[in-house]
Amino acid sequence: MKKFSRRLTTLKSKVEPKLYTINEAVSILKATSNAKFKETAEAHIALGLNPKYADQQLRATVILPKGTGKLIKVAVIAKGEKLTEAISAGADVSGSEELIDEILKGRLDFDKLIATPDVMPLIAKLGRVLGPRGLMPSPKAGTVTLDVAKAVNEFKGGKVEYRVDRTGIIHVPFGKSSFSQEDLVLNLQTIKESIDRNKPSGAKGKYWKTFFLSSTMGPSIQIDITSLL
Protein backbone atom coordinates (compact mmCIF):
# COMPACT_ATOMS: atom_id res chain seq x y z
CA MET A 1 0.00 0.00 0.00
CA LYS A 2 1.33 3.41 -1.01
CA LYS A 3 2.16 5.67 1.94
CA PHE A 4 1.92 9.45 1.87
CA SER A 5 3.76 11.97 4.03
CA ARG A 6 1.76 13.70 6.75
CA ARG A 7 2.02 16.93 4.76
CA LEU A 8 0.61 15.42 1.57
CA THR A 9 -2.10 13.54 3.50
CA THR A 10 -3.22 16.86 4.99
CA LEU A 11 -3.23 18.53 1.58
CA LYS A 12 -5.11 15.63 -0.03
CA SER A 13 -7.85 16.04 2.57
CA LYS A 14 -8.58 19.46 1.05
CA VAL A 15 -9.41 17.91 -2.33
CA GLU A 16 -12.78 16.19 -2.68
CA PRO A 17 -13.18 13.22 -5.07
CA LYS A 18 -15.17 15.20 -7.62
CA LEU A 19 -14.77 17.20 -10.82
CA TYR A 20 -13.85 20.86 -10.37
CA THR A 21 -14.22 23.76 -12.77
CA ILE A 22 -10.95 25.11 -14.10
CA ASN A 23 -11.11 28.13 -11.79
CA GLU A 24 -11.87 25.98 -8.73
CA ALA A 25 -9.06 23.57 -9.58
CA VAL A 26 -6.48 26.32 -10.04
CA SER A 27 -7.59 27.95 -6.79
CA ILE A 28 -7.10 24.66 -4.91
CA LEU A 29 -3.74 24.09 -6.60
CA LYS A 30 -2.53 27.46 -5.33
CA ALA A 31 -3.93 26.83 -1.85
CA THR A 32 -2.22 23.43 -1.54
CA SER A 33 1.15 24.58 -2.86
CA ASN A 34 3.14 25.29 0.29
CA ALA A 35 6.57 23.77 -0.27
CA LYS A 36 9.65 25.82 0.56
CA PHE A 37 10.35 26.53 -3.11
CA LYS A 38 8.38 27.85 -6.06
CA GLU A 39 6.44 24.82 -7.20
CA THR A 40 5.71 24.18 -10.87
CA ALA A 41 2.05 23.92 -11.87
CA GLU A 42 1.59 20.79 -13.97
CA ALA A 43 -1.21 19.39 -16.14
CA HIS A 44 -1.62 15.64 -16.64
CA ILE A 45 -3.98 14.92 -19.52
CA ALA A 46 -5.17 11.48 -20.66
CA LEU A 47 -6.24 11.42 -24.30
CA GLY A 48 -7.98 8.74 -26.33
CA LEU A 49 -4.82 7.97 -28.29
CA ASN A 50 -2.72 4.85 -28.79
CA PRO A 51 0.71 6.21 -29.76
CA LYS A 52 1.94 2.85 -31.04
CA TYR A 53 0.05 3.82 -34.21
CA ALA A 54 1.73 6.55 -36.28
CA ASP A 55 -1.55 8.39 -36.95
CA GLN A 56 -2.31 8.62 -33.21
CA GLN A 57 0.97 10.15 -32.10
CA LEU A 58 0.94 13.70 -30.78
CA ARG A 59 3.98 15.92 -30.36
CA ALA A 60 3.72 19.68 -30.63
CA THR A 61 4.71 22.99 -29.07
CA VAL A 62 2.72 25.84 -27.60
CA ILE A 63 3.70 29.34 -26.48
CA LEU A 64 2.24 30.01 -23.04
CA PRO A 65 1.03 33.64 -23.04
CA LYS A 66 2.08 34.13 -19.42
CA GLY A 67 5.32 32.16 -19.69
CA THR A 68 6.58 29.22 -17.65
CA GLY A 69 8.18 31.08 -14.77
CA LYS A 70 11.41 29.24 -15.47
CA LEU A 71 14.64 30.67 -16.88
CA ILE A 72 15.35 28.52 -19.93
CA LYS A 73 18.95 28.09 -21.08
CA VAL A 74 19.02 27.70 -24.85
CA ALA A 75 21.90 26.24 -26.85
CA VAL A 76 22.26 26.59 -30.63
CA ILE A 77 24.36 24.58 -33.05
CA ALA A 78 24.74 26.40 -36.37
CA LYS A 79 27.30 27.88 -38.74
CA GLY A 80 28.14 31.28 -40.21
CA GLU A 81 25.49 33.97 -40.11
CA LYS A 82 22.97 31.65 -38.43
CA LEU A 83 25.36 31.26 -35.53
CA THR A 84 25.73 35.05 -35.38
CA GLU A 85 21.92 35.40 -35.36
CA ALA A 86 21.68 32.97 -32.45
CA ILE A 87 24.24 34.88 -30.42
CA SER A 88 22.48 38.20 -31.14
CA ALA A 89 19.14 36.68 -30.08
CA GLY A 90 20.55 35.78 -26.68
CA ALA A 91 21.44 32.09 -26.97
CA ASP A 92 23.13 31.01 -23.73
CA VAL A 93 25.38 28.47 -25.45
CA SER A 94 26.34 28.49 -29.12
CA GLY A 95 28.80 26.90 -31.51
CA SER A 96 29.21 24.41 -34.32
CA GLU A 97 31.56 21.40 -34.48
CA GLU A 98 33.36 22.41 -31.29
CA LEU A 99 30.08 22.50 -29.34
CA ILE A 100 29.15 19.07 -30.70
CA ASP A 101 32.47 17.74 -29.36
CA GLU A 102 31.84 19.37 -25.97
CA ILE A 103 28.39 17.76 -25.74
CA LEU A 104 29.90 14.37 -26.61
CA LYS A 105 32.27 14.89 -23.67
CA GLY A 106 29.37 15.59 -21.32
CA ARG A 107 28.48 19.27 -21.60
CA LEU A 108 24.75 19.55 -20.96
CA ASP A 109 24.31 22.96 -19.31
CA PHE A 110 21.18 23.88 -21.29
CA ASP A 111 17.45 23.14 -21.34
CA LYS A 112 16.82 23.33 -25.10
CA LEU A 113 19.04 22.63 -28.08
CA ILE A 114 18.25 24.30 -31.40
CA ALA A 115 19.97 23.41 -34.67
CA THR A 116 19.81 24.44 -38.31
CA PRO A 117 18.96 21.70 -40.86
CA ASP A 118 22.45 21.73 -42.42
CA VAL A 119 24.16 20.61 -39.19
CA MET A 120 21.74 17.78 -38.36
CA PRO A 121 23.93 15.12 -40.05
CA LEU A 122 26.73 16.17 -37.68
CA ILE A 123 24.41 16.05 -34.67
CA ALA A 124 23.23 12.50 -35.40
CA LYS A 125 26.10 11.10 -33.33
CA LEU A 126 24.74 12.93 -30.26
CA GLY A 127 21.61 10.78 -30.22
CA ARG A 128 22.80 8.54 -27.39
CA VAL A 129 23.57 11.57 -25.23
CA LEU A 130 20.64 13.83 -26.09
CA GLY A 131 17.86 11.33 -26.83
CA PRO A 132 17.29 9.98 -23.29
CA ARG A 133 17.19 13.56 -21.99
CA GLY A 134 14.66 14.77 -24.55
CA LEU A 135 17.17 17.27 -25.96
CA MET A 136 17.63 15.94 -29.51
CA PRO A 137 16.59 18.67 -32.00
CA SER A 138 13.45 17.84 -33.98
CA PRO A 139 11.37 19.69 -36.59
CA LYS A 140 8.17 18.70 -34.75
CA ALA A 141 9.49 20.26 -31.57
CA GLY A 142 10.44 23.46 -33.39
CA THR A 143 14.11 22.93 -32.57
CA VAL A 144 15.33 22.29 -36.12
CA THR A 145 14.87 25.56 -37.98
CA LEU A 146 16.52 28.20 -40.14
CA ASP A 147 14.91 30.97 -38.07
CA VAL A 148 17.16 30.45 -35.07
CA ALA A 149 16.57 33.93 -33.64
CA LYS A 150 12.80 33.37 -33.50
CA ALA A 151 13.27 29.93 -31.94
CA VAL A 152 15.61 31.27 -29.26
CA ASN A 153 13.18 34.08 -28.37
CA GLU A 154 10.17 31.76 -28.27
CA PHE A 155 11.74 29.12 -26.02
CA LYS A 156 13.14 31.74 -23.67
CA GLY A 157 9.76 33.47 -23.66
CA GLY A 158 7.49 30.56 -22.71
CA LYS A 159 7.34 28.02 -25.51
CA VAL A 160 6.93 24.45 -24.24
CA GLU A 161 6.89 21.10 -25.98
CA TYR A 162 4.39 18.38 -25.13
CA ARG A 163 3.84 14.83 -26.34
CA VAL A 164 1.76 11.80 -25.42
CA ASP A 165 3.69 9.10 -23.60
CA ARG A 166 3.21 5.42 -24.37
CA THR A 167 0.06 5.31 -22.23
CA GLY A 168 -1.57 8.23 -24.04
CA ILE A 169 -0.92 10.80 -21.31
CA ILE A 170 0.53 14.30 -21.70
CA HIS A 171 2.50 15.85 -18.83
CA VAL A 172 3.05 19.56 -19.37
CA PRO A 173 3.99 22.50 -17.09
CA PHE A 174 1.83 25.60 -17.30
CA GLY A 175 3.58 28.03 -14.98
CA LYS A 176 4.42 28.36 -11.31
CA SER A 177 1.91 28.01 -8.49
CA SER A 178 2.88 31.56 -7.49
CA PHE A 179 1.34 32.91 -10.73
CA SER A 180 -2.01 34.66 -10.44
CA GLN A 181 -5.08 32.50 -10.92
CA GLU A 182 -5.95 34.41 -14.10
CA ASP A 183 -2.51 33.77 -15.62
CA LEU A 184 -2.60 30.04 -14.84
CA VAL A 185 -6.09 29.69 -16.30
CA LEU A 186 -5.05 31.51 -19.48
CA ASN A 187 -2.02 29.23 -19.90
CA LEU A 188 -4.21 26.15 -19.39
CA GLN A 189 -6.78 27.29 -21.91
CA THR A 190 -3.98 27.90 -24.42
CA ILE A 191 -2.70 24.34 -23.90
CA LYS A 192 -6.23 22.95 -24.35
CA GLU A 193 -6.65 24.86 -27.63
CA SER A 194 -3.26 23.64 -28.89
CA ILE A 195 -4.07 19.99 -28.13
CA ASP A 196 -7.39 20.34 -29.97
CA ARG A 197 -5.71 22.05 -32.91
CA ASN A 198 -3.10 19.28 -33.21
CA LYS A 199 -5.52 16.36 -32.83
CA PRO A 200 -4.03 13.39 -34.71
CA SER A 201 -5.89 12.20 -37.80
CA GLY A 202 -6.18 8.68 -36.39
CA ALA A 203 -7.83 9.69 -33.10
CA LYS A 204 -10.96 7.62 -32.50
CA GLY A 205 -13.78 7.84 -30.00
CA LYS A 206 -13.55 10.17 -27.02
CA TYR A 207 -10.50 12.43 -27.43
CA TRP A 208 -10.41 14.03 -23.97
CA LYS A 209 -10.54 11.41 -21.20
CA THR A 210 -9.26 12.94 -17.95
CA PHE A 211 -7.54 16.20 -16.99
CA PHE A 212 -5.69 16.56 -13.67
CA LEU A 213 -3.70 19.44 -12.19
CA SER A 214 -1.08 19.37 -9.46
CA SER A 215 1.82 21.38 -8.15
CA THR A 216 5.24 19.76 -7.80
CA MET A 217 4.60 18.59 -4.23
CA GLY A 218 0.82 18.88 -4.13
CA PRO A 219 -2.20 16.58 -4.54
CA SER A 220 -3.96 15.87 -7.85
CA ILE A 221 -7.10 17.84 -8.68
CA GLN A 222 -9.42 16.64 -11.44
CA ILE A 223 -10.92 19.18 -13.83
CA ASP A 224 -14.35 18.98 -15.42
CA ILE A 225 -13.19 19.17 -19.03
CA THR A 226 -16.41 20.91 -20.08
CA SER A 227 -15.34 23.93 -17.99
CA LEU A 228 -12.50 24.45 -20.48
CA LEU A 229 -14.81 24.66 -23.48
Curated annotation (Swiss-Prot):
It is found in: Plastid, Chloroplast. It comes from the Eukaryota. GO terms for biological process: translation. Keywords: Chloroplast, Plastid, Ribonucleoprotein, Ribosomal protein, RNA-binding, rRNA-binding. GO terms for molecular function: rRNA binding; structural constituent of ribosome. PROSITE patterns: RIBOSOMAL_L1. GO terms for cellular component: chloroplast; large ribosomal subunit. Signal peptide: none annotated. Binds directly to 23S rRNA. Might be involved in E site tRNA release (Potential). NCBIfam families: rplA_bact (TIGR01169). HAMAP family: Ribosomal_uL1_B (MF_01318_B). Belongs to the universal ribosomal protein uL1 family. Part of the 50S ribosomal subunit. PANTHER family: 54S RIBOSOMAL PROTEIN L1, MITOCHONDRIAL, LARGE RIBOSOMAL SUBUNIT PROTEIN UL1M. This is Large ribosomal subunit protein uL1c. It comes from Pyropia yezoensis (Susabi-nori). The gene is rpl1.
